UniProtKB/Swiss-Prot annotation:
Substrate binds at residues 21-23, 36, 59-62, 119, 159. Keywords: ATP-binding, Cytoplasm, Glycolysis, Kinase, Nucleotide-binding, Transferase. This is Phosphoglycerate kinase. Pathway: Carbohydrate degradation; glycolysis; pyruvate from D-glyceraldehyde 3-phosphate: step 2/5. Belongs to the phosphoglycerate kinase family. The gene is pgk. It catalyses: (2R)-3-phosphoglycerate + ATP = (2R)-3-phospho-glyceroyl phosphate + ADP. SUPFAM superfamilies: Phosphoglycerate kinase (SSF53748). Its EC number is 2.7.2.3.
Length: 403
């Protein structure tokens, strides 16, 4: 069912509450990466260019104490947003009370207001975590500030918080509209089509440290994928399940039986490394050696080897849909990044396929290579995109009205 989208709304003269994802890295008041702010611009611009008043809510980081509040204020984000929009943005250093209500009442059509970090509500009270615990009274209060609600925060779509599900529930309860923003719409389109209606051959590439993080994804995508290519630390649990020697490699001993089950269920769909780049210690300076699918006792696998890269590329060259989540090795160390970077290059060369990247390290690899413009879609949600690939219902999407 198609969701109600921001451009289905008549925003002129209306106060539009927008849950954005401004959870960006900030150190000493300086934003390290503004991609999430940039990703929210189309929705914000639509509202203000059509005469709406945009009231923006977001969390930033994990707020555990008053000491965190200085580092986790959204003030620098509001300043950066003002630069990107090339117009003034009002920052309100609170998200509840008279100061907030006055700022909103003083808005003119086309104005933008950013309220303070929603997670300050997790410590500013005697009621426990009001925001991340989805306190209905907080959701109702925030909903009372606007005429309609737009959820554009895919990064928190797998969570039921007061600032997404709480507001949407209260809005709908009052006969008001709750719609998806353009970013949420894009995520639903690309991830939804890949999971539910992929063009074949459909290749899933999974990496990262733990099998346990990806069990749901593998189970959901075995019947849908033509191939599931596995690299990263999780590959060694699968290799151990096949009876290979894995030396000192990272693996989950308690998941070996599960890996065997997944291998049996998948048949020949799961493709594992046939060689590995190994070292005696987890260090960029350690001497490297290419070994087969058995790793010597004194060594650990830290990247996929050249034969595996060639094998994976050969499978990818015919793909029409590709979803990649997780690095192929210890990507943070340049000497063990080649597998991840080569997979990124292979995806960039697929001109006749839909390519989707999710997860922090895979996304970082795409940026490092400068291939982002050649990728169909880079997901803005780590946990949310994994949950979506598992086939789970995401509360932040479910709370938005259908057309």
């Amino acid at each position: 069912m198609a969701k109600l989208i921001v451009d289905d709304l008549d925003v002129k003269g209306k106060k539009v509450l927008v849950r954005v994802d401004f959870n960006v890295p900030i150190k000493d008041g300086v934003i390290g990466d503004d991609n999430r702010i940039v990703a929210a611009l189309p929705t914000i611009k639509y509202i203000i260019e059509h005469g709406g008043k945009a009231i923006l809510l977001s969390h930033l980081g994990r707020v555990k104490s008053d000491a965190d509040k200085k580092e986790l204020s959204l003030k620098p984000v509001a300043e950066r947003l003002s630069e990107l929009l090339k117009k003034p943005v009002t920052f309100v250093p609170s998200n509840e009370g008279k100061e907030v209500e006055d700022a909103i009442n003083n808005m003119k059509d086309g104005d933008v207001v950013v309220l303070e970090n929603t997670r300050f509500q997790d410590i500013d009270n005697d009621f426990g975590k009001r925001e991340s615990g989805n306190d209905p009274k907080l959701g109702e209060y925030w909903a009372s500030l606007g005429d309609m609600f737009v959820n554009d925060a895919f990064g928190t779509a797998h969570r039921s918080h007061a600032s997404n599900v709480g507001i949407a529930t209260a809005m709908k309860g009052n006969g008001k509209l709750a719609a998806a923003g353009y970013l949420l719409e894009k995520e639903i389109k690309y991830l939804g089509d890949a999971v539910d209606n992929p063009v074949h051959p459909f290749v899933t590439i999974l990496g990262g440290a733990k099998v346990s993080d990806k069990i749901g994804v593998i189970n959901n995508l075995i019947p849908k994928s033509d191939h599931i290519l596995i690299g990263g630390g999780m590959a060694y649990t699968f290799l151990a399940a096949q009876g290979h020697e894995i030396g000192k490699s990272l693996f989950e001993a308690d998941k070996v039986d599960l890996a065997k089950e997944l291998l049996e269920k998948a048949g020949d769909k799961i493709v594992l490394p046939v060689d590995n780049v190994a070292a005696t210690e987890f260090s960029n300076d350690a001497s490297r050696e290419v070994v087969g699918d058995d790793i010597p006792d004194n060594m650990m696998g830290l990247d996929i080897g050249p034969k595996t890269i060639a094998k994976f590329k050969d499978i990818l060259k015919d793909a029409k849909t590709v979803v990649w989540n997780g690095p192929m090795g210890a990507f943070e160390m340049p000497n063990f990044a080649e597998g991840t970077l080569e997979i990124g290059r292979a995806l960039a060369n697929l001109t006749d396929a839909t390519t989707i990247i999710g997860g922090g390290d895979s996304t970082a690899a795409a940026k490092q290579l400068g291939i982002a413009p050649k990728i169909s879609h880079i997901s803005t949600g780590g946990g949310a995109s994994l949950n979506y690939l598992e086939g789970k219902v995401l509360p932040g999407i479910a709370c938005v009205q259908d057309k």
